[in-house]
């Protein structure tokens, strides 16, 4: 993927916003990258891969742990399965999973994609905190079930499906890693954090995904352009129409966020949304527990990424207000 670099000062206040956040969270390095009107207009890196004095500097090929931003790749794999006619969003998940549990009978793939399934794991047992389609809750079990459905129905792992795209886009700084290497940042976190885990799996079903800032931005650009890159339609545009359009059931309360295929999609601003209120309808975003954020604003032909090597938030830090400010600052720059 070839993009011209035309750096400008239009988004300097966004860089300042990300630098301020990097000072508030427990990180040793960060970056920001913006594509606007098909040009790279902002690209900045600062800090080091870890807190060690001799740590590698954050740079173009530095790969950040993206945490839940990995769900954008899982969402793509599910959309691929839908586009291939292998599954439907309103299929009950029991059609594909041999889990003998009465609470799953009315849970659909749509519910998993939009965090409206109501499922959770408690002491290793599957429970349901609300009837599928009636509320919204961010739980990891939905992602596990989606990756299983992808593997069962396509015969491929999430990683195998998206690797086909990575090859077409010539991505070399995106992947799931069972072993660390010098280009991967150290993830700074509290000792014993229960939300942190590592994995040897490289199937795309676990949290061990690392991506460079520039390739994450280009992944967003791939979505913005609905797969049409350098005059070539890499994959069917229908995949992106599925991924980035609102899929949430209309039975949930208006205070809850609206989702596409795991992406947060802007409709009306809601109390629990991670998208800033200034962002127009149709904008879509995904945020990781490391603070890594990928935002696409189709109305303004813009993709923005921020990345940090922290994990979780310090006490008193309002991560939702912070990520909304990131998006709202971008809009202020666009409209000023």
Curated annotation (Swiss-Prot):
Keyword Cytoplasm assigned: no
Keyword Transcription regulation tagged: no
Gene3D superfamilies named in the record: DD-peptidase/beta-lactamase superfamily
Domain of life the protein comes from: Bacteria
Family matches, as Pfam families: Beta-lactamase (PF00144)
Keywords: Plasmid
Listed name of the protein: Uncharacterized protein BpOF4_21049
Organism field: Alkalihalophilus pseudofirmus (strain ATCC BAA-2126 / JCM 17055 / OF4) (Bacillus pseudofirmus)
